[in-house]
């Protein structure tokens, strides 16, 4: 139901975007979930990365009640989250050539693993280089990005390419360039970003698909339960012990 107040307008816009990704990205979501299920079944590890606010959707699938225990956060110091001071340093680091390759070469990632790279614009050096180098190392790469940026902005990577150009599977968040859903005559800039809502939903849709795919194959999905329900800690201890060699957030 439409609402003329900003809060209602934003929620309507977010709901419309969620419907679009549900309908238009269904095949890509299915493919991404299947890729994660294949990786789990074949003994691989799962990783997710996002810079700045894009890291929120990556963090939301790591050590998460109802999520896959095998999903690990790939961290880049000063880039994941906005806890670095000044916060603008994180944005600057995204544009540094060579950083992504150094991170991957120092990480536990190896051929046969799957890496989800989340970048709204997909234009900066870090996500582009990360996808390129990850594939060169033999990883499967899923990109979560807004494809609109590739046609309406220029790449900041030396190759002139975007994240979407170096992924096995691309999930398009449909977010408009600028990431702001609302405008008002009385407000001098667009406002109310929806990228976190949509990107987090895409990530959960992919992990849900992966869990169901594993179950369809007769494999118990390595899921975590909430630690705030009876028996949750015992359940999680069993799963973390069983898959400990593929889980890095406990080390």
UniProtKB/Swiss-Prot annotation:
GO biological process terms, semicolon-separated: D-glycero-D-manno-heptose 7-phosphate biosynthetic process
One Pfam short name: SIS_2
InterPro entries: RpiR-like_SIS, SIS_dom, SIS_dom_sf, SIS_GmhA/DiaA_subfam, UPF0309
Protein name: UPF0309 protein SCO4393
GO CC terms: cytosol
Domain SIS: 36-220
Homology family: Belongs to the UPF0309 family.
Species annotation: Streptomyces coelicolor (strain ATCC BAA-471 / A3(2) / M145)
Domain of life, source organism: Bacteria
One GO molecular-function entry: D-sedoheptulose 7-phosphate isomerase activity
CDD domains: SIS_RpiR
